[in-house]
């Protein structure tokens, strides 16, 4: 139960930080335009109607399609969140759900996701992203690492035979 509370806090915190960071970035951009923060990082304004890296953004009804896809993914993640028995996995899913909700809120309010962080080195420019994207990416990576570690730990030899593995129940 405690992990669920921490997971819900993660959802709310990530969602709130994402929305605040976007509001701040929108305000900053409207007053100052694109701004270099570091040699490799700039504050920009990109309205992303597609998915990752702006893919499929030119589709006529992309916002509607991706809104429904986002809702489906969030609902699926929430079911997994509720069913999860692993504290760390619950927190990872909370971070992912919070980020996904942040981007969904943009789609519902603006018809596109607001991206404002641009990383670049010389002529190389990574597609713009936002705090929610970072949280979704980090949450998924942490969740996958936990799953790999859990499954590696769950396989144990019970017979002395190196080819005989069984699943250890925790």
Swiss-Prot record:
Active site: 115, 133
Chief subcellular location: membrane
Gene Ontology CC terms: plasma membrane
Ranges annotated as spanning the membrane: 5-25, 62-82, 89-111, 126-146
One GO BP: proteolysis
Taxonomic superkingdom: Bacteria
Pathways per UniProt: Protein modification; lipoprotein biosynthesis (signal peptide cleavage)
Compartments reported by the entry: Cell inner membrane
The protein's Enzyme Commission number: 3.4.23.36
Pfam families: Peptidase_A8 (PF01252)
Catalytic activity: Release of signal peptides from bacterial membrane prolipoproteins. Hydrolyzes -Xaa-Yaa-Zaa-|-(S,diacylglyceryl)Cys-, in which Xaa is hydrophobic (preferably Leu), and Yaa (Ala or Ser) and Zaa (Gly or Ala) have small, neutral side chains
Topology versus the membrane: Multi-pass membrane protein
InterPro entries named among the record's database cross-references: Peptidase_A8
GO molecular function, one term: aspartic-type endopeptidase activity
Keywords, comma-separated and alphabetical: Aspartyl protease, Cell inner membrane, Cell membrane, Hydrolase, Membrane, Protease, Transmembrane, Transmembrane helix
Function description: This protein specifically catalyzes the removal of signal peptides from prolipoproteins.
Similarity section: Belongs to the peptidase A8 family.
HAMAP family assigned: LspA
Protein name from the UniProt record: Lipoprotein signal peptidase
Organism: Anaplasma marginale (strain Florida)
Gene name for this UniProt entry: lspA
